Amino acid sequence: MKTLYSLRRFYPVETLFNGTLALTGRDQETTGFAWWAGNARLINLSGKLLGAHVAHAGLIVFWAGAMNLFEVAHFVPEKPMYEQGLILLPHLATLGWGVGPGGEVIDTFPYFVSGVLHLISSAVLGFGGIYHALLGPETLEESFPFFGYVWKDRNKMTTILGIHLILLGIGAFLLVFKALYFGGVYDTWAPGGGDVRKITNLTLSPSVIFGYLLKSPFGGEGWIVSVDDLEDIIGGHVWLGSICILGGIWHILTKPFAWARRAFVWSGEAYLSYSLGALAIFGFVACCFVWFNNTAYPSEFYGPTGPEASQAQAFTFLVRDQRLGANVGSAQGPTGLGKYLMRSPTGEVIFGGETMRFWDLRAPWLEPLRGPNGLDLGRLKKDIQPWQERRSAEYMTHAPLGSLNSVGGVATEINAVNYVSPRSWLATSHFVLGFFFFVGHLWHAGRARAAAAGFEKGIDRDFEPVLSMTPLN
């Protein structure tokens, strides 16, 4: 009887229902993996695995280019980006392309160029992927030893890690150069409601940059997500880029120490699990950043944050009722607390009502009205500018919430009908993807550790019930 699994099997495998679905060198008998296990068949075929990864990169870049052009084609300059379901153009606008004062889009040509460049890049990657998957050498070790590798070769693995770190560092510096020399980036805090500007006075103080990492993640602290000026963000990228490049050089030049050799599992599946774990962390951090941070993700493009929409509603009604003659400093609400203004636990003057829970919100349209002790009553009575009223009314009606009832005091039933904030999309998608990647991390880590320890969980193939059943065909 033909065995449907490799005798030298290191992984639990599934049986093929149809033995003809095989490619030479990539069939189940040679690799221990069925056709549907995808890249697992290529674990020891470095050339073919390269093809799979390059083709995958091509698909990713093709999506980016095609979606970019789709958004440009559908873009209406008269409406805010966040009303149009856009998720790519806000990123380009944040980088300072095509926008002017107040986040107004003045030129869509840079967006078009971005889309076309990504499409062209995807064609190059697609060709490379097909070439290496079908025509190139199956393994790179013999012909191109620099690009070849064996998973157990610890020194080679850390060299590859080092190269990746250097590339990440260069990526961080690309943002720095854009902000410093190539037109600047969009600063939502620029006076009068935001503008594109070059960053001139970088924050490089390690106590400031690494102070963010030491902050509590709760309340007014907010860990790294609390960053609210571009000097700190760009300065942080200088530090990150430098650390990545220096760490990359270190990993290329050194071999793993004995404790590292003992601590880690050195196999392809182990590296996959480490990567998935890192991506899960990225996903969770990105989720928090896009949900709470309105500096790295300006509200002009992504819509207001939840707290921002709630505070904007309180501000809008304060403005309205003050015009109608209300004394906003002393009016009481139904609970006996201040209707429009009250004090926070630490004594600052804050907005009253249900939005009190968001009292530590910082937003460019609100900060000019604060004094040393919170909101300044004199400024609220005399200094409110038309652009602040317009922006808060706009944000009040575009909360990133899909609830049919009030959330944080914001009436959301209108929004649930025909508006989903890009913040909701980006935060939810990154949380869900981060969670799936984390589960994948646990799964592959468990398998890699089991294989390294010399045992695996799986069905004993010799007594598998399906072997005694009539074949499907």
From Swiss-Prot:
Gene3D superfamilies: photosystem ii from thermosynechococcus elongatus. GO terms for biological process: photosynthetic electron transport in photosystem II. [CaMn4O5] cluster binds at residue 367. The chain crosses the membrane at residues 69-93, 134-155, 178-200, 255-275, 291-312, 447-471. Keywords: Acetylation, Chlorophyll, Chloroplast, Chromophore, Manganese, Membrane, Metal-binding, Phosphoprotein, Photosynthesis, Photosystem II, Plastid, Thylakoid, Transmembrane, Transmembrane helix. It is a multi-pass membrane protein. GO terms for cellular component: chloroplast thylakoid membrane; photosystem II. It is found in: Plastid, Chloroplast thylakoid membrane. PSII is composed of 1 copy each of membrane proteins PsbA, PsbB, PsbC, PsbD, PsbE, PsbF, PsbH, PsbI, PsbJ, PsbK, PsbL, PsbM, PsbT, PsbX, PsbY, PsbZ, Psb30/Ycf12, at least 3 peripheral proteins of the oxygen-evolving complex and a large number of cofactors. It forms dimeric complexes. Belongs to the PsbB/PsbC family. PsbC subfamily. This is Photosystem II CP43 reaction center protein. The gene is psbC.
